[in-house]
Amino acid sequence: MLLLKKLSEAAGVSGCENEVRNILKEELKEYADFKTDALGNLLFEKKNKGKKPRIMLAAHMDEVGLMITSILKNGFLKFESVGGIDDRILVSKTVTIGPNKIKGVIGAKPIHRQDPKERENALKIKNLYIDIGAKDQEDAEKKVKIGDYACFDTEFEIFGENIVKGKALDDRIGCFVVAEILKRNYEVEICGAFTVQEEIGLRGSGVAAYQLKPDVAIVVEGTFASDVPGTKEEEYNTVLGMGPAVTTMDRSFIANKGMRDRVFEVAKKNNIPCQPRRTNLGGTDGGRIQSIGEGIPTIVISVPTRYIHSPVSVADINDINNTILLINSLILDYQERGV
């Protein structure tokens, strides 16, 4: 899990994925040839060129976060969200800002000073600020610039029984899975991309797929798990500990039926736990990849993850390992039977 720890703790808000990209290039330099395209996608080709079919693997490097929009006279920072973040979870959270990783705390008007009406309503992002301990605007401007990114400051840890917690598991968990697959050898062509700007509109994946021109694509995600108090069992999207989740449909994507059926067949044949992703909420790079060129048969396989798009997410190590096993088995099935 050392690589996943590095990936989780790296700063990589949409549009600023450099740190994540560098970690992956260093980790995988022995296994693949890399190219960074104009948008920032990290494209790869396995060093041992195989036969058809040409299989694309994709996982996005970016995470939701914040961007500094103004520096006030008293040294506090105003900000906007980058990607989908619930304003209600921001107060009192610690962040790191910009290339120098300046520490900050997200603050709000003290509850003791809030009137009854203010206390009844959830705080909006426009009412929040970041405190970096600056004396005034001049002091703050020495440390931070408008346009700097801020990401949550969260330590990756293993806790409980085979459970991990950390920030940005959507989708550093997918990057980790793809990295582990890249370390294996296959007789088919393996290409793919660690993509950028997924959280703000699936921007990188289409550019990547256009360049790679695969026969089929496998997108690896960290999807939300709703197996928590307050949600009825029949409304669970995915459940921790029940294996990778296979998407039928989300707001951007409808799975290739043949690929979806094949994934479940491969899982059953190899005794790998696997679950359907039950709701059609959210969107993934799969929606963009499948519509490139003449169309690319695509499947999205995800690791169930609680509390995504927040300062800390939770996932099951067994689900991560079973996702690696499932994708490995699926590639071997393509190697044996073709498309």
Please place each PLM-identified region on the residue numbering.
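N-terminal hydrophobic/helix-forming segments and targeting peptides
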Residues: 1-339
